Amino acid sequence: LRQILTTKGNIDLKPTDIQDPEYFHKVVDCQYACPAHTPVPEYIRLIAEGKYTEAYMINWDSNVFPGVLGRTCDRPCEPACRRGRIDEEPVAICRLKRVAADNRDDVIPYMPQGPFTPNGKKVALIGAGPASLTVARDLSPLGYEVHLFDEQIKGGGFMRSQIPAFRLPEQVLDDEVDYILRLGIHTHFKHYVSSLKEILEQDYDAVFVGTGAPRGRDLPDLPGRQEGDANIHIGINWLGSVAFEHTDKIGKTVIVLGGGNTAMDCCRTARRLGGEDVKVIVRSPFASMKASPWEKEDAMHEDIPIIDNHVPKSFVIENGKLAGMTFEKVEAKYDANGKRSLVPTGEPDVFYPADDVLIAVGQENSFPWIERDCGVEFDNWEMPVVDKVSFQSTHPKVFFGGDAAFGPENVITAVAHGHQAAVSIDLLCNGKDVKTERLSPFVNLHSMKMGIHEWAYDSTIDEYDRLAVPQAPKEFTLKDRKKEVELGFDPLAGYKEAERCLNCDVQTVFDAPKCIECDACVDICPTSCITFTADGEEADIRQRTKVPALNLKQDIYVADGLKTGRVMVKD
């Protein structure tokens, strides 16, 4: 529903159109917050029922990599979870996804079965990361001849090169990449594409660029950078070197610069490769770091201190070799508009010793292989000009997605880009407009009457606190960089955590002619989400609900036609 306001005296809400799937799409907050719109409550119910294979396939249809994302997702669904509004913690949606992945049966019989009838169209995918693999997964069953190019020996992109094996076991990634490649994808691994023009000359009907943001930012102007180069490493390059087993050790004293998830992966990997005194040093305050809270917690659990409010001043070189770094202490100051500045405290600079330094201060895109006269326009920041709906560039046959489109994001965003780009490519190849003829996000609507014994759950709110995911002892995991730290929920814990879900996708609808306004539904509702109230302006109604409905982005359900003239409102 798009809330429709009228202007007849008061600004009253019109009744919700329950035939419009947009309302039911938006009201399931976790699903709406997921970039790939994974139907979260649906698969959580299946997990509670022990139907892990079905739960896995629900995920695979939307997010393509349930096993990967069940371990590594940035979890945009969890801040949106309604459970977090009545408890301190939302449902552990991400880790429940892993429960389905870890306990599934053979899922190949439930996947598209080739060979597929060719439709005569050919598509090139540059880069074999999550965005490109999603495009391949979506287009191949439609009969497209899909060619996948990557300079690495396997598919996976940054999921393979930048996410350490102690967070994402290689076998988990291999399995989910192979599910896609078995759909008849023509792979060209160990093949670096050096010219987009050459690709376009090969009669592809469309080209998708999913090459990520492969260039880590450096600190080239910091004094001592060149002299200490042998022991100063770019974080993402170093992680890739470790992943492909070109690097297997590091010095005992390590400084990691940066406050994002890459910095957390670098410091934890360094601990496993011989780093005994590893510390993260970041410019910003601890609370403002870009790293996910759980990533920071995991690093500190492994005895890695995070030193905030320190700006790097120089690399210190002694006898021609890196000896450490100096830092200036700063504090965050905010102006009237909330803009932050880092202001020196005036204290003396601080020296920290280091055998090695890992720089993880950000990533940049790099497209040296795309000729600037091939029809793809670039902006002032050397980023391709890409439409945010269709993911089409200024060259009608060339599409971008993942980090290559708008800069560094995460796996689930790359998957979402891949889905949308695949839709656009299919529209283009069928002679349709890539923007005006695309459909809204798909929503499953099932209308049913349910007796009390048909509910999969009881009607009360289970009082379980959010369960912590068990971890292997660090005295073992720190000795082996491939030893997975998180053990995942067992089936019983998965069931208990699944029962914390409020089933927001199960939507009651009101039948006003049958309502006698006894308010029994209000009294029995465990979440206090139903209100009978006088009609009026939307802002006023939102304040009058039993729990004020203050999230203006979230539509409220409204039904009228009661004999008293009141309206039924559900948030």
Residue ranges, per PLM feature:
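FAD-site-proximal beta/loop scaffold in flavoenzymes
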Residues: 227-251, 335-408, 534
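Feature captures the FAD/FMN-dependent oxidoreductase FAD-binding
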Residues: 47, 117, 122-126, 174-220, ...
